[in-house]
Amino acid sequence: MINEKIWHEKLHRHVGQYFSIDKILYQKKNKYHDIIIFQNSIMGRIMAIDGVVQTTEKDEFIYHEMLTHVPIFYHGLIKNVLIVGGGDGGILREICRHKSIENITMVEIDLNIIDLCKQFFPKHNNNAYKDPRLKIVIDNGLNFVQKTKEKFDLIISDSTDPIGCGKDLFLSDFYFHCKNCLVKNGIFVGQNGVFFLQKNDINQSYKNLKKNFHDVSFYQATIPSYYGGTMMFSWGTDNIDFRQINIKNLEKRIKDKKLTFNYYNSNIHISSFYLPQYIINTLDKS
């Protein structure tokens, strides 16, 4: 919702956040999304889809580093990656930093998102769209995983919230077909919203993931532009040993890559899986 120079998020009914608008850079509704991109003096450029903040220049690095590097470093031998969604290019940018990865497939329902983010958020992708390892498929994510014969070591679901086009990417059917697209010991991760305000959605994701993977959990990060508390990331795999790696071995994997980060490190990685008791209690009841 826009009120003069103020934009109000409309994800939650009784609470929310607002941003002042310095300048509207783009605003249009297409058959998939209602998109606005505007400038804010604190957060830089902000993109909202269907009334919900998707990304900002200021804090995008937290989300993209955590959703990408946690599964890659836990696994240790990722070669083939599928990104479902992710048209802003941030996940792609982080994946492309790993030179050992051989193939990257991105499935994005709306080509317009990719084009807009290339124009208005160039630092998100940092020229990663030119990487020769990348293949872009314009399709619905659920439809793609239902039909593809390809196999992946890692699937990252960088979706919108479970409303509109994004709803399909939280269904048990989606997780089932993602599982079928993974090689043995493959990993699925995805964004799952803010637990404090989206508890029911996260509980349902937990149930759906448990139907398809032996090791299911969530890990977390605090991202200022995602209102209401810590952002939850879902984790699913059949290999129960990945999360048993000790911190020294994890640190060695990270050091060997010779990468630098703005948020992610080995301590953040390990501690992100230690959830507050109220979340544990709620998941146990589900």
From Swiss-Prot:
Pfam families: Spermine_synt_N (PF17284), Spermine_synth (PF01564)
Positions contributing to S-methyl-5'-thioadenosine binding: E108, N140, G141
PROSITE patterns documented for this protein: PABS_1, PABS_2
Signal sequence interval, chain numbering: none
PANTHER family associated with the record: SPERMIDINE SYNTHASE (PTHR11558:SF11), SPERMIDINE/SPERMINE SYNTHASE (PTHR11558)
Function noted in UniProt: Catalyzes the irreversible transfer of a propylamine group from the amino donor S-adenosylmethioninamine (decarboxy-AdoMet) to putrescine (1,4-diaminobutane) to yield spermidine.
Record protein name field: Polyamine aminopropyltransferase
Gene symbol of the encoding locus: speE
